[in-house]
């Protein structure tokens, strides 16, 4: 399996770290992994290698404000999620070129905004650890974060605001061992996340506001209707993931996708699994279900 790593200078001269794993067999398609908030692409090494062994080329990149070799003053901040998906599109175009292979994304809210913005560019969507924001829940959160941004400044990383977010995610976990327990029921993964200097950092008020805003935006039927209706969607989550409202939010989001006219929507929910379901205990079974879904739609 060949691997290529490089930096791509995007439209506004920001450098984006990119890694590509090429399969050793005839490629079934290209899978682009979008990492989550306050983490980085290297955490997905094992998953990328496994996907390559199953016949897919795999792209990863670090979103602006994230990664290893970046200006520390930028860590945990970006102004606009639309610029972030613009970066991802430039990465995809650079690697994909004119190759006529299916293009599939694994991600969460950034992936959801991407497929809304470039509906005809994407052939498949895998949402892991995502959630559904109804108006009654999402709008007050967005308004509060918008106010905090105005009071403290968009680039400010406010400790108590970040703490408030993690506390809300940990409220059902007893006993609580660490502030990162909500991400996984696997203590080893939690400890690795905490020890990683490039994960778990505080993020800016603007990044939190943008995340909440677009979580709400991409949960609305009118915005989902613009998606490519032929694009199959797989939602993967744990019943103990607070972001997915302990399974209920995932099922609601799937129903909205179906109501919008998406032809193939599947939900894989797993008992006793938390937010980072792909890194959970016994994740081999979860990965196997993922490979089966991919093979159903994408063949050589």
Predicted features and spans:
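Active-site glycine-rich loops that stabilize anionic/oxyanionic intermediates
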Residues: 35-39, 239-240
């Amino acid at each position: 399996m060949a691997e290529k790593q490089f930096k791509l200078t995007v439209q506004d001269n920001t450098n984006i770290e990119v890694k590509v794993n090429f399969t050793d067999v005839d490629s079934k398609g290209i899978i682009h992994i979008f990492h989550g908030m306050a983490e980085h692409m290297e955490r997905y090494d094992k998953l990328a290698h496994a996907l390559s062994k199953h016949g897919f080329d795999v792209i990863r990149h670090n979103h602006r404000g994230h990664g290893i070799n970046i200006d520390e003053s930028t860590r945990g901040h970006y102004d606009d999620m639309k610029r972030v998906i613009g970066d991802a599109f430039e990465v995809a175009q650079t690697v994909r070129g004119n190759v006529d292979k299916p293009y599939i994304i694994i991600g969460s809210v950034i992936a959801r905004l991407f497929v809304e913005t470039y509906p005809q560019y994407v052939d498949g969507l895998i949402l892991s650890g995502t959630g559904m924001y109804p108006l009654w829940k999402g709008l007050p959160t967005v308004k509060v974060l918008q106010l905090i941004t105005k009071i403290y400044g968009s680039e400010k990383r406010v400790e108590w605001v970040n703490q408030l977010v993690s506390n809300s995610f940990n409220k059902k976990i007893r006993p609580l061992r660490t502030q990162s327990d909500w991400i996984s029921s696997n203590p080893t993964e939690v400890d690795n996340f905490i020890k990683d200097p490039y994960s778990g950092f505080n993020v800016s008020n603007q990044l939190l506001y943008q995340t909440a805003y677009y979580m709400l935006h991409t949960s609305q039927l009118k915005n989902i209707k613009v998606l490519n209706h032929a694009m199959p969607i797989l939602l993967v989550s744990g019943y103990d993931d607070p972001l997915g409202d302990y399974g209920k939010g995932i099922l609601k989001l799937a129903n909205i996708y179906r109501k919008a006219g998406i032809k193939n929507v599947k939900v894989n929910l797993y008992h006793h699994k938390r937010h980072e379901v792909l890194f959970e205990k016994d994740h081999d079974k979860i990965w196997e279900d993922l490979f089966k879904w991919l093979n159903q739609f994408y063949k050589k």
